[in-house]
Every structure is written in C-alpha cells, then in structure tokens.
Amino acid sequence: MLIDITLRITPKMATDAQGNERKAMVGHLGTHFDVMDKDFPLEFTRRRGIVFDVADIGGRDIDIPDIELSKVEGGMFVAFRTGFIESQGYGGKVYFSAHPQLSNALIDALLDRNVSIIGVDFAGIRRGGEHTPADQRCANRGAFVIENLCNLKAVVEAGGACVMHTYPMNFAGMTGLPCRVIAEM
C-alpha cells in the first residue's frame, strides 16, 4: 500500500500562505526541505522509515521519552505525526509561529543515530530564530528536515514502519526544495 504524505497545494492555499510569494520563489511552499548548503543524495530517495505518533503531546517540546528511540536506526527517515497540519490548516500565522517543535535533545539523539531525514507535519523542527540553525545543525550531520507532511495518521494506523520514497525537485539556486514523499507500507 502506498500513502502520499505530501501536502497538496491548491491555488487558495498558495494565495493564503503567510509570505507566500517569497516562500514560493525560494521553494518553501508546501512539503519541502530547506537545502542549507548540501545536495540531496540520490540514495536518500529510498529510506527505511518510521512515523512516531506524538499527537498527544502539547504545551511542551516533543522529547526523547515521547518516542521509542530504540526503533531508530542509522539511515532512517524518522517522521513525527502531531496532527497539527490537520487541526490548524496549512499557511496561517499560528501554523508558522506556534507549531510544535522537537527538543534539542531529541534532535541530537536522532543525529547521534545517523538518521538521513527528519520529517514533521508542521512548519519546522524548531520555531522562530532557532529554525534555520536547527536545520543547519542537521545538514552538518548529514540529515535533511522535511516540513509540512500530511496524512501521517494513515501511516501510523498501518503500523508506522514503512519505506519512505522522497523525490525533491532538481532546482538550483533555491533555499528550499519542494518534494513528493510517499510511504510504502
């Protein structure tokens, strides 16, 4: 079974997205990853994956005790389902400024396990001024962060473990790359 976990962008969503023209011009609209200063390796297009359901976490960062870290292995695509994209909708001020975030300890634990990709169903693994430095820290350790995933509940309901297929656009000179992400159960 294949589950598309890519956010489908409608013309209305593109129009309504906060700062949409700037975001679209540099590849940050919808499901995408921030390029930082790295190239996406072709071997990352197919990764063993796992989706952790952390939808019950609220009012604090998502942290190491909230997941089964022992299930995370090197090279994996590790995604977090919070339900935020479904509850808030994509593109508004709250979506971009008050989204969940991963604790720095959890980010470091994932990087210590040499994950390839960290995926989230919200606007970034850290908020505000911590967003870009967190993405760069991941890039420096060989991991990419994919933002604005959707349909992760279906992956969780199908067991959570899967093969993730990630296909970024082959654009040059962009700070973000839109991508299509499919979970193969």
Listing of model-derived features with the role each one plays in the protein:
Residues 1-185:
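Active-/binding-site microenvironments in catalytic and ligand-binding cores
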